[in-house]
Amino acid sequence: MLSKNQIKFVRSLELKKNRKREHLFVAEGPKVVGDLLKAGFRPHSIFSTDPRQDGQLVTEEELQRISFLQHPQEVLAVFEIPNSEHRPITPNGLSLALDGIQDPGNLGTIIRIADWFGIDAIYCSQETADVYNPKVVQATMGSIAHVPITYCNLVELLSKVKCPIYGTLLDGEDIYQKELQKNGIIVMGNEGNGISQEVRSMITHRLLIPNFSNSKETAESLNVAIATAITCSEFRRR
């Protein structure tokens, strides 16, 4: 049986300040929890309605009380946030730099896309949403366990690298015609404002995903997660 303190504690991890203080985050569902365990994330506590599952056995009603999902998925786990402070920031291969991505769903989807396309690392500006937000974790569908993610000063990072820096901009070259290298950093910007001016000045190769309107009116822009998928796909296609 869950105590009131347990319920209160798990629910408190919805807030970034509490996650930061406790160095803990929540993941839900057999797929996400299983992937995190396989990747070596250290569980603080596990709650499950399945008696075959490790951890504390709870009822469906109790799981509902601690879950952040509309329809809880059998298991909820609290994991330790890995210490990335001493992780070397040395981009290799093909990486993503996220400049102020705000929507948790977009961030989670981008992480999942990065996992699918074999992106080596993701570098997030301090203005980007917290990767350990429960909504982000769930949107990754377990990919958070597979892609190294680091928060850093993007301008500082980009000023030190010697690889190509790509960014999707309205004044860029057609991505389908542009010669792309296998290694580099792809910058994706904020949903409303795009790539910030400071980061934009660091971009060495400007890319454009053209529309195919046939002169009719189209959407003003692409969702940032969709744009990320198109861009990563084009890099991997070459």
Language model regions located:
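RNA substrate-binding interface of SAM-dependent RNA methyltransferases
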Residues: 38, 88-173
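Amphipathic alpha-helical repeat scaffolds
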Residues: 29, 102-110, 219-226
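Active-site regions of enzymes building and remodeling cell-envelope glycoconjugates
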Residues: 52-64, 93, 164-165, 179-185, ...
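Glycine/small-residue-rich loop that forms an oxyanion/phosphate-binding "nest" at active or ligand-binding sites
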Residues: 55-84
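Active-site/ligand-binding-proximal alpha/beta "capping" segment
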Residues: 167-219
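Boundary-proximal intrinsically disordered activation/regulatory segments immediately upstream
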Residues: 1-50, 128-129
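Short acidic-hydrophobic, aromatic-tinged amphipathic segments that line or gate anion-handling sites
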Residues: 1, 57-59, 145-155, 207
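Structured adenosyl-cofactor binding patch, chiefly the S-adenosyl-L-methionine
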Residues: 116-117, 131-145, 197, 201-238
